Regions:
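Glycine-rich phosphate-binding "P-loop"
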Residues: 26-27, 31, 105-106, 133-135
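Conserved beta-alpha-beta core of the PfkB/ribokinase-like small-molecule kinase fold
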Residues: 129-165
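Short, solvent-exposed amphipathic alpha-helical segments in soluble enzyme
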Residues: 18-21, 69-73, 147-150
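Conserved N-terminal subdomain of the carbohydrate kinase-like
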Residues: 23, 46-130
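Glycine-rich phosphate/adenosyl-contacting loop at the front of the ribokinase-like
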Residues: 1-55, 64-65
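Short, well-ordered, mixed-charge alpha-helical segments that flank or form enzyme active sites
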Residues: 11, 109-112, 139-143
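General beta-strand structural signal in soluble alpha/beta enzymes
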Residues: 3-4, 56, 78-79, 132-133, ...
Length: 165
């Protein structure tokens, strides 16, 4: 399985009694993990012992940190270099169980960045029967980004699943 999750993130999960806007808050705990819908799909594939490669943009120092965290989880990542820094997300988990997620948009990409991404997905599809496209795409990605990846899958005779807005 190839997982197209172009807009990776670093998630900072912050635990607190209650989120109160307009106040200075002290968190009870902080966990830093790689995130994004594609990473979640890769985790499920690993749990099911399904061979999978995640293809994502991994810009800057934060991209290098995410790449290391992804490897620490035993997930295979094909990182596509791009300028800027990887986006982050703040996940606030309250004692009540309520969750608030604040996502950054991700670094803007150019047309040639997306072309390199498509090439990485196409190359990764060799020997795989399924392409999963999951999560958001970075600013600057073509409006038909996932449609183009589905067409790549069709040319490779791979099934395609899209889970994105």
């Amino acid at each position: 399985m190839v997982i197209a999750g172009p807009n990776l993130t670093i998630d900072r999960t912050l635990t607190i009694d209650e989120l109160r806007l307009g106040e200075v808050l002290r968190f009870d705990g902080v966990a830093v993990t790689p995130g994004g819908k594609g990473v979640n799909v890769a985790r499920v594939a690993r749990a099911l012992r399904a061979p999978a490669v995640l293809v994502g943009f991994a810009p800057g120092r934060t991209g290098a940190a995410a790449t290391a965290l992804i490897a620490d989880e035993g997930l295979e990542l094909r990182a596509v270099p791009v300028g800027g820094e990887l986006r982050s997300a703040a996940v606030v988990l309250e004692r009540s169980g309520r969750v608030t997620v604040m996502n950054e948009p991700g670094p803007p990409i150019a047309a040639e960045d997306w072309e390199r991404y498509e090439a990485a997905v196409a190359e990764s599809l060799q020997g795989h029967a399924v392409l999963v496209c999951s999560g958001s795409v970075p600013p600057g990605a073509p409006h038909d980004a996932y449609g183009r990846l589905v067409a790549l899958a069709a040319r490779s005779r791979a099934a395609a699943i899209v889970d994105a807005r």
